[in-house]
Every structure is written in structure tokens, then in C-alpha cells.
Amino acid sequence: MDKISNIYNFDDPPPDKLSLELFIIEKKIGKGQFSEVFRAQCTWVDLHVALKKIQVFEMVDQKARQDCLKEIDLLKQLNHVNVIRYYASFIDNNQLNIVLELAEAGDMSRMIKHFKKGGRLIPEKTIWKYFVQLARALAHMHSKRIMHRDIKPANVFITGNGIVKLGDLGLGRFFSSKTTAAHSLVGTPYYMSPERIQESGYNFKSDLWSTGCLLYEMAALQSPFYGDKMNLYSLCKKIENCEYPPLPADIYSTQLRDLVSRCILPEASKRPETSEVLQVAEHMNNYFSPSGDQSTTPSTQF
């Protein structure tokens, strides 16, 4: 049994014995409205984890408390190499603590900033290498009827081995087979779909919009709807009207530019299915991979 299984199966200690005393907090690695995330060492097994501490009783809003508990339920259902893994949860010192897989190297936003600071674009081969892993993670989530609702570079973690881990499901929502849409304005404005801004109800296609925005940002090194002097109103109008600069045709492939434009469509029903996005990503990653035949033009059948 590996180290991860030891903690995941609660072999030692049992779940009702978990407490903050069993973790050595090393440093803070993230902060949210109601939470802080720390790099921590488990004392009973040689394993570093991300310990997310949520101030449960400071959340006077009942919905916020439910969202935190919902995050735990969602994570229990997910088991994929490209999704941050849930290990355990417990309440200690009036805090809800969630023990998560640690992604050491950082996140996609850090990688984008690195290239932007260096005045370089991310090579398309590299874009597909990471994007295909995100597409796999999203396909797994959607197959479980789970929507992420906050896909953005800062929530796409990258390990030291170059493995993508989609995380931060605090805004996730479980969709039963009878549920067709959700009505709550949450998420990051730059990546929010028109239907979410208009609060007209949305479904899994909103994740595809955000995924298209992320793919665009990997290529352009900035959000498609970014502006130097923008307020929330002007941002929302740009999103609703799908006003964004096209990616340069002389730098990026037709397939990449086409996938972006298909995901960033105002009408959710016209966006591709998650399976289609994954198919394109797999095809393009195979084309750009070292073992691929670089002399062959990539297919445009998608």
C-alpha cells in the first residue's frame, strides 16, 4: 500500500482521531475569502499535503457553509490523476479542515506570468501538453455530473513532474440527473460565461466557456476580456458580446484558434461537448508530441 492509500483509507489514524496536532504546518501557500491553505507534513506517515483550513463558524451565511460541505462530498467522488485528490476532513478548533493532495510546482497562472515576464509566448506544443490534461480532468468531473464553476489558471495546479491537477472545487455543484441548470452568481468575472453574468441559469457548458478562456490565455498570456481601464460593467458587456482580440493566425494553429472560438460562444447550446474538447486536445497533443509525425498536417475534422 502506498503512502496516499495509507491516509486515504484512514488506516492510521482512524478518521475520528484526526486533529491539527497530527500535522506540522510548514507555510501558507494560499488564501481565500473563508479559508487558508498550508503546506503541511503528516506526522504518522511520510507525506506532505495541502491543508485547507476553513473558518466554518465565521460563515454566517448558510449557503457558504453548505458550499464547503459540498466541496467535501464532491471530492470524495473524484478519482483521477489530473484532479487534486481528497484525503480526509475533520473539524478542529472551530475550523473545517480538508486534507488535499499537494501540487508542489505551482499553478498555471504562475507559468503564464513567467512567460509574460520573459517576453515569450508559450509554445503551442507546451499548451497542448497541459491543456489535454485539463480536458481529461474536466471530462472526468462531468462524467460524475460535477461542474467546477471556477476554472481559471490559478485553479489549475502543476506538479514538479509536469502533471496538471485541477483543484479548488469550493464552488463546485453536484448535478443530479434531474437538474438542468443552477442559479447562483459565483466564480471569477474574467472567466464567467454570459449566462452566468445574466443569472439566467447555466449548466455544464459554462465550464466549456471558462476552459476556452483559459486556452486563449495560455496562448495570448492574458484573458480574452482583459482591459487596462475596465470596470465590472464594461467587462460584463465585453463578455456578453464576445468582444476579444483574435489569436494570431501566423503563430497558432487553426485547431487551437477554432477550439477557442467554439468554446467562447454567447449561446451555450452551440458550444462543444466536453468529449469534443477532449478529442481535439488529444489529437493535437499527439500531433505535437515527440513521437508524433511532424510532417503530417493536423486534422481539421473537429
Curated annotation (Swiss-Prot):
Cofactor(s) the protein requires to work: Mg(2+)
GO biological process per UniProt: gonad development; molting cycle; multicellular organism growth
Gene3D superfamilies the record matches: Phosphorylase Kinase, domain 1 (3.30.200.20), Transferase(Phosphotransferase) domain 1 (1.10.510.10)
Enzyme Commission identifier(s): 2.7.11.34
UniProt cross-references to SUPFAM superfamilies, sorted A to Z: Protein kinase-like (PK-like)
Active site per UniProt: D150
Major subcellular site: cytoplasm
Top-level class of the enzyme under EC nomenclature: transferase
All residue ranges annotated as the Protein kinase domain in the record: 23-288
Key words, A-Z: ATP-binding, Cytoplasm, Developmental protein, Kinase, Magnesium, Metal-binding, Nucleotide-binding, Serine/threonine-protein kinase, Transferase
SMART domains, per database record: S_TKc (SM00220)
InterPro entries assigned: Kinase-like_dom_sf, Prot_kinase_dom, Protein_kinase_ATP_BS, Ser/Thr_kinase_AS
Catalytic activity: L-seryl-[protein] + ATP = O-phospho-L-seryl-[protein] + ADP + H(+); L-threonyl-[protein] + ATP = O-phospho-L-threonyl-[protein] + ADP + H(+)
Protein family according to the UniProt entry: Belongs to the protein kinase superfamily. NEK Ser/Thr protein kinase family. NIMA subfamily.
Name of the featured protein: Serine/threonine-protein kinase nekl-3
